[in-house]
UniProtKB/Swiss-Prot annotation:
Protein name according to UniProt: Transcription factor SOX-6
Subcellular locations according to the entry: Nucleus; Cytoplasm
Modified residues (Phosphothreonine): T119, T401
Biased composition (Basic and acidic residues): 25-34, 341-357
Acidic residues composition bias: residue spans: 795-808
Post-translational modification: Sumoylation inhibits the transcriptional activity.
Region (Disordered) location: 1-51, 329-360, 380-470, 752-772, 786-827
UniProt cross-references to InterPro entries, sorted A to Z: HMG_box_dom, HMG_box_dom_sf, SOX/SOX-like_TF
GO biological process: astrocyte differentiation; brain development; cardiac muscle cell differentiation; cartilage condensation; cartilage development; cell fate commitment; cell morphogenesis; cellular response to transforming growth factor beta stimulus
Crosslink feature (Glycyl lysine isopeptide (Lys-Gly) (interchain with G-Cter in SUMO)) location: K404, K417
Length: 827
């Protein structure tokens, strides 16, 4: 049983079947080798073995038989697929482990043969051999196809190429094929050239595009810049128009001021005001000064001027002409004791060289003068005065060289505590003691910034006039004055010009006298101290005159005077010297106080410390700053164009111009400032600027700044104007050193408060309130711009004033641009 199971199913076949299978295999081999002999042969041996005439037709016929060849290949592929199926089935049956029955094996072989060949003869062959044979044939065909390139080319040729090949021979075809690489290289070179040209063209286009972009961007930038420039120009034009409008407004204001001043009497200023007689003559000529008709004038006599008592110190300090009263003789003990004391002091303080007959005081004349002065108080400041007879002057024959001594002798500052004390005082020297001096004769005082100048290092000018030879040329000037008694000479220009010419002549005479007698000026130089003019250029000379007296005489101060650290601002010398300090009469700011009345009221004082410089140490000037350098020429130009323009207005114009200038325009002046500073540093290596002390005013125990104090004074002045507007009477004109007639008040000293009314020009006022302001120096107090010398000060104005001092005043300091203005100076 086991042997039967182990045998294969093919072992059971008979010998006949085995023989048939072998025969079938051999026949298939023969058929396979004989069926398609031509199809398996290569084409080129056939083509080359034949002659050229038969070569092309054979090739064409072979190509035409491709369809048959394709059908054969497709049939072979179908057979191969069927054989693969049979092989897989056969391998499956062979791998089976179970024995097969003979009938089953025969049945399977029949199925296989029927599926594969469909004929009984092919059932006997070996399917494996058939499959191997077909695979080998296919591989041989593929190998021959790859080796024969020409046959592949022939298959791929189109009909056009076939026709061309029919017309051409093989050599021409081969030659054309051989020339192809050269043509390809040529074409490649042409293509590369075209590519290069295209690349360059593209680069050019890109460059042109970039240039266009840049050009457009530059045009846009230019347009933007032009728009910005146009906008800036418009803004600049707008600013310039605004500045022009502001300047036009300022010009209109100046024109209004000029028009307002035009309604006032014309200001005729003597060119050489060194002699008080000609000064008084010119001032009287321009103002139509009417002398009392009761007083006669003779060519050789002194012309009388109204008696100015000691109570007029404030009015005199505000610009009253320092006329000197001739020595008079008081012989009326029955009059008011206060008036008698005034007359006694007046007589004792007159110059010893002035003697001669004059009118004597009588009680009636003194009372008339006192009544006239009280009447003048009640007249409003701006009221125009009619020409009324003046009572005969009880002061006697008054000469213009005596009133200065009267003012010196009766000034509130220089009075001794005792009312009856009468001794000659040298008022041109600085006071020494700090004790307040009581003055029962002065209800009003004027406080001014003190003069910057000091007697130290003052040059000894030999050209300073002296009124020693007072009688020289007096007759001609008195003739002019006597001719002015008529009201018909108002505004007579010829008379004024004659007075000016006489002033020049007398100036020359006084200069000759000064050269002949240079040391005989004791007690006379103080009369020159207060010769103030409204023109700021001439006020520097007055500053030099103030301190020349103590320098030449060498006299010390009397007992009872103030110390050197305290400056009395009620003295006319100090008041007018303060004008020269600022370089402008408009800068003269006046401060007032009101005593309670009686003989125990103390004077108001300005207490200041010295700069820390010894009296023997020379004063070193400060170098000019950029503004002062620039304004030096500008101020002269303005003065040439407008000689009558006030210094304050010029300073405002210059300050406005300086502020409107650009830094580039200011640059050369800053360079000049640096150069001057360098020279100054080389000249004075140890120089150290010592600023002035600040000032405050104490009123009713309160510390006020100068601006607040001035505002308070204005309000009180307005109250007093309203209080004294009733019962106006004609007032007595007062001729000042500046040639301006102040219709202000002349008050006699009384035990009750006697307020004084003055004009707006002098700014002198009074108040019955018992307030006692004291101006003292405070270093810690910083002053603002509103409390300085001017109410409406602008930047650069103080620098201009400092420049004025620099030009003419040897004792002045020079402020810089970044420095706060300091209108007060110490000794």
């Amino acid at each position: 049983m086991s042997s039967k199971q182990a045998t294969s199913p093919f072992a059971c076949t008979v010998d006949g079947e085995e023989t048939m299978t072998q025969d079938l295999t051999s026949r298939e081999k023969e058929e396979g080798s004989d069926q398609h002999p031509a199809s398996h042969l290569p084409l080129h041996p056939i083509m080359h073995n034949k002659p050229h005439s038969e070569e092309l037709p054979t090739l064409v016929s072979t190509i035409q038989q491709d369809a048959d060849w394709d059908s054969v290949l497709s049939s072979q592929q179908r057979m191969e697929s069927e054989n693969n199926k049979l092989c897989s089935l056969y391998s499956f049956r062979n791998t089976s482990t179970s024995p097969h029955k003979p009938d089953e094996g025969s049945r399977e072989r029949e199925i296989m043969n029927s599926v594969t060949f469909g004929t009984p003869e092919r059932r006997k062959g070996s399917l494996a051999d058939v499959v191997d044979t077909l695979k080998q044939k296919k591989l041989e065909e593929m190998t021959r196809t790859e080796q024969e390139d020409s046959s592949c080319m022939e298959k791929l040729l189109s009909k056009d190429w076939k026709e061309k090949m029919e017309r051409l021979n093989t050599s021409e075809l081969l030659g054309e094929i051989k020339g192809t690489p050269e043509s390809l290289a040529e074409k490649e070179r042409q293509l590369s050239t075209m590519i290069t040209q295209l690349i360059s063209l593209r680069e050019q286009l890109l460059a042109a595009h970039d240039e266009q972009k840049k050009l457009a961007a530059s045009q846009i930038e230019k347009q933007r810049q032009q728009m910005d420039l146009a906008r800036q120009q418009q803004e600049q034009i707008a600013r310039q128009q605004q500045q022009l409008l502001q300047q036009q407004h300022k010009i209109n204001l100046l024109q209004q001021q000029i028009q307002v001043q035009g309604h006032m009497p014309p200001l005729m200023i003597p060119i050489f005001p060194h002699d008080q007689r000609t000064l008084a003559a010119a001032a009287a000529a321009q103002q139509g000064f009417l002398f009392p008709p009761g007083i006669t004038y003779k060519p050789g006599d002194n012309y009388p001027v109204q008696f100015i008592p000691s109570t007029m110190a404030a009015a005199a300090a505000s610009g009253l002409s320092p006329l000197q009263l001739q020595k008079g003789h008081v012989s009326h003990p029955q009059i008011n004791p206060r008036l008698k004391g005034i007359s006694d002091r007046l007589g004792r303080n007159l110059d010893p060289y002035e003697h001669g007959g004059g009118h004597s005081y009588n009680h009636k004349q003194i009372e008339q003068l006192y009544a006239a002065q009280l009447a003048s108080m009640q007249v409003s400041p701006g009221a125009k005065m009619p020409s009324t007879p003046q009572p005969p002057n009880s002061a006697g024959a008054v000469s213009p060289t005596g009133i200065k001594n009267e003012k010196r002798g009766t000034s509130p500052v220089t009075q001794v505590k005792d009312e009856t004390t009468a001794q000659p005082l040298n008022l041109s020297s600085r006071p020494k003691t700090a004790e307040p001096v009581k003055s029962p004769t002065s209800p009003t005082q004027s406080l001014f910034p003190a003069s910057k100048t000091s007697p130290v290092n003052l040059p000894n000018k030999s050209s300073i006039p002296s009124p020693i030879g007072g009688s020289l040329g007096r007759g001609s000037s008195l003739d002019i004055l006597s001719s002015l008694n008529s009201p018909a000479l108002f505004g007579d220009q010829d008379t004024v010009m004659k007075a000016i010419q006489e002033a020049r002549k007398m100036r020359e005479q006084i200069q000759r006298e000064q050269q002949q007698q240079p040391h005989g000026v004791d007690g006379k130089l103080s009369s020159m101290n207060s010769m103030g003019l409204s023109n700021c250029r001439n006020e520097k000379e007055r500053t030099r005159f103030e301190n020349l007296g103590p320098q030449l005489t060498g006299k010390s101060s009397e007992d009872g005077k103030l110390g050197p650290g305290v400056i009395d601002l009620t003295r006319p010398e100090d008041a007018e010297g303060s004008k020269a300090m600022n370089g402008s009469a408009a800068k003269l700011q006046q401060y007032y106080c009101w005593p309670t009345g009686g003989a125990t009221v103390a004077e108001a004082r300005v207490y200041r410390d010295a700069r820390g410089r010894a009296s023997s140490e020379p004063h070193i000037k400060r170098p000019m700053n950029a503004f002062m350098v620039w304004a030096k020429d500008e101020r002269r130009k303005i003065l040439q164009a407008f000689p009558d323009m006030h210094n304050s207005n010029i300073s405002k114009i210059l300050g406005s111009r300086w502020k409107s200038m650009s830094n580039q325009e200011k640059q050369p002046y800053y360079e000049e400032q640096a150069r001057l500073s360098k020279i100054h540093l080389e000249k004075y290596p140890n120089y150290k600027y010592k600023p002035r002390p600040k000032r405050t005013c104490i009123v009713d125990g309160k510390k006020l700044r100068i601006g607040e104090y001035k505002q308070l004074m204005r309000s009180r002045r307005q109250e007093m104007r309203q209080f004294f507007t009733v019962g106006q009477q004609p007032q007595i004109p007062i001729t000042t050193g500046t040639g301006v007639v102040y219709p202000g008040a002349i008050t006699m000293a009384t035990t009750t408060p006697s307020p004084q009314m003055t004009s707006d020009c002098s700014s002198t006022s009074a108040s019955p309130e018992p307030s006692l302001p004291v101006i003292q120096s405070t270093y810690g107090m910083k002053m603002d711009g509103a409390s300085l010398a001017g109410n409406d000060m602008i930047n650069g104005e103080d620098e201009m004033e400092a420049y004025d001092d620099y030009e003419d005043d040897p004792k002045s300091d020079y402020s810089s641009e970044n420095e706060a203005p300091e209108p007060v100076s110490a000794n």
